[in-house]
Amino acid sequence: MSKITTTHVRDNVKELLKYSNETKKRNFLETVELQVGLKNYDPQRDKRFSGTLKLPVCPRPNMSVCIFGDAFDVDRAKSCGVDAMSVDDLKKLNKNKKLIKKLAKKYNAFIASEVLIKQVPRLLGPQLSKAGKFPTPVSHNDDLYSKVTDVRSTIKFQLKKVLCLAVAVGNVEMDEDTLVNQILMSVNFLVSLLKKNWQNVGSLVIKSTMGPAFRLY
């Protein structure tokens, strides 16, 4: 049973979009984030959940993705306009923690050719997994462009040491219906991951990158 109504979410989305598109329009595409505060949860004792959800519409079309590819995938990446690194490029990092950390910071997500995925931990150590950015595999039969779109449309809820999390659920160029739908999907999915469902939800807020926060719960 959901504790928030579609009408309430819609009213807040209207306000948020009005602020970002009329009151204070920025010269870049603002992302809309769902910020969650949890309660009655002990990250030390309770199971730290993690789950991914593919949204119908990509929340961050400009999200940066890098491909670790064999020759075939590096070529495909170039034609899709996506950054790519070959095995030699990865070897050049020489397991240098600083450089790998920098790489993990530079991109929001990674994709790797199936043939390379097993080599990633050996070449890069545990840094990408620690950052929650272990690459998604792609095979030569997959359409690379669709795979990149899938990765850009997938959001991840992962509880770490603190009781708050934030995920991108949309952007301010989306229409009201799309944004409302993406928010409700994300909230329901998150609640399903929690041990006591709604009893673990302390607060739900939506916010555009530079805009004020609107409280849903």
Curated annotation (Swiss-Prot):
GO terms for cellular component: cytosolic large ribosomal subunit. Keywords: Ribonucleoprotein, Ribosomal protein. Coiled coil: none annotated. It comes from Eremothecium gossypii (strain ATCC 10895 / CBS 109.51 / FGSC 9923 / NRRL Y-1056) (Yeast). The gene is RPL10A. It comes from the Eukaryota. This is Large ribosomal subunit protein uL1. It holds the Pfam family Ribosomal_L1. Belongs to the universal ribosomal protein uL1 family. CDD domains: Ribosomal_L1 (cd00403). One of its GO terms (molecular function) is RNA binding. GO terms for biological process: ribosome biogenesis; translation. Disulfide bonds: none annotated.
